[in-house]
A protein has these predicted regions:
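Compositionally biased intrinsically disordered regions enriched in Thr/Gly
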Residues: 21-31, 36, 42-271, 311, ...
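N-terminal glycine/threonine-rich, aromatic-flanked beta-hairpin/loop signature
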Residues: 283-326
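Hydrophobic/aromatic beta-strand elements that line small-molecule binding cavities or substrate pockets
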Residues: 134-139, 166-169, 287-292, 312-318, ...
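Tryptophan-anchored aromatic micro-motifs
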Residues: 265-286, 315-317
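Beta-sheet ligand-binding and adhesion/scaffold domains
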Residues: 324-386
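C-terminal motif of bacterial Sec signal peptides marking the signal peptidase cleavage site
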Residues: 16-19
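Generic short beta-strand segments
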Residues: 150-156, 234-236, 276-279, 295-304, ...
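Sec-dependent signal peptide recognition
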Residues: 2-10, 14
Length: 386
């Protein structure tokens, strides 16, 4: 009995210990604070576009678009072609310039019906005397970031043949057409005044006209050839055929140093031309005769005719290193011998090849009341009378 009781007590004790072990709370470890997770995003920058390569002469091609007509034997009886200028590359500049060239080509194509009409109306061109409607292109400048092209258009359909010239000029940095006044290192007033003087001289030399209209002194277009401004004209403007006239303005500034200009002035006798606008819309061509000696003396005569001057003057001159020509003169009126006066004239000298331009630098002490920026075009006598 006692043994059974001991076993029962032992069993109860074991059960009690087991129950305690199940109800004792588990020891919990404090949580270690976790650092907030950070997401790092790598920023990948877009690669910068490569700068556009400058357009050079090697990037410019002339592609002849030929649709000449042939007879049954394969001989050409009507020359019909156009020289299309193409700038290579995918740049915006190339695209803009090519669009302008394409527009000029499409203008040529718009006249194709006229060619077909002449050929269908019984006109009989032959291989020995073919008709022609052609446009030839010459790339005349790619320097100083300026692209210039001279076009020569020829037309003959059995009657009178015509030749016309025109130019297209572009800024190679922007692809935009370049105005004549913006292409040269001179003020727009000086450029336009020099153009008038050049054309006035040309008209006088070819037509012996003292006066001309303002309208004739405006070129229809221009190009740059041998770094020089060239004025372009259609047929029947300054003659039956069109023409090109070089104007002594060049790209890039002075072509000669002051020392070279002094030598140039001293070795020639000069005849100069400039224009005076009249109230009636006409432009009178004025003439100046000039000579410069090595001893610093000079002589000047000016009026409307190179054979009959109104005023003559003698004195001294200086040409500074910054190309300013100063003339101190005693001037007499040819027709009023008692009329004389002293005058000081100053000009900025801009020299081209054989010609020079004398530019009025201020409105003070000006020759014949010329305004600032107006010009006198001077040419060696030997050149003028050759």
């Amino acid at each position: 009995m006692k043994r059974a009781l001991c076993l029962l007590l032992s069993l109860l004790l074991l059960l009690s210990l087991a129950a305690c072990s199940q109800t004792q709370p588990e020891e919990t470890k404090p949580e270690t604070p976790q650092a907030e997770s950070q997401t790092t995003t790598e920023i990948v920058s877009e690669p910068e576009p490569e700068p556009e390569k400058p357009i050079t002469a090697s990037d410019i091609n002339v592609q002849r678009q030929d649709s000449s007509k042939k007879d049954s034997s394969g001989q050409v009886i009507c020359e019909h072609y156009y020289d299309l200028v193409v700038v290579k590359g995918e740049s915006e500049v190339a695209a803009a310039i090519n669009a302008a060239f394409q527009a000029d080509y499409e203008e040529f194509l718009s006249k194709n019906n006229e060619v077909e009409q002449y050929l269908s109306e019984g006109f009989q061109p032959t291989p020995d005397a073919p008709f022609f409607f052609t446009v030839e292109a010459e790339v005349t400048n790619t320097e100083d970031n300026v692209l210039s092209v001279l076009y020569c258009e020829k037309w003959y359909m059995g009657g009178t043949s015509n030749i016309s010239y025109r130019g297209l000029t572009f800024d190679l940095e922007s692809g935009k057409p370049l105005n004549m006044e913006d292409a040269f290192p001179l003020s727009s007033t000086t450029v336009l005044d020099c153009v008038k003087n050049t054309l006035s001289y040309y008209i006088y030399q070819n037509n012996l006209s003292l006066d001309t209209s303002e309208e004739l002194l405006q070129p229809e277009s221009y190009c740059i050839q041998n770094r020089q401004l060239v004025l372009c004209f259609d047929s029947y403007t300054l003659g039956r055929d069109g023409t090109t006239i070089a104007c002594p303005i060049t790209l890039g500034g002075q072509m000669k140093t002051a020392a070279e200009q002094r030598s140039m002035l001293q070795k020639n006798e000069w005849i100069g031309f400039w224009c005076a606008s009249e109230d009636n819309g006409q432009v009178s061509r004025l003439v100046m005769d000039m000579s410069f000696e090595t001893d610093g003396s000079c002589s000047v005569a000016f009026g409307f005719l190179e054979t009959e001057f109104d005023f003559v003057g003698t004195g001294t001159y200086q040409l500074s290193d910054d190309h300013i020509l100063t003339m101190n003169l005693s001037i007499s009126d040819v027709y009023e011998e008692s009329e004389s006066y002293d005058a000081t004239y100053q000009f900025e000298v801009f020299s081209g090849n054989d010609e020079s331009i004398l530019i009025q630098p201020t409105d003070d002490n000006s020759l014949y009341g010329q305004r600032k920026g107006s010009t006198v075009l001077i040419i060696p006598y030997d050149t003028f009378f050759s």
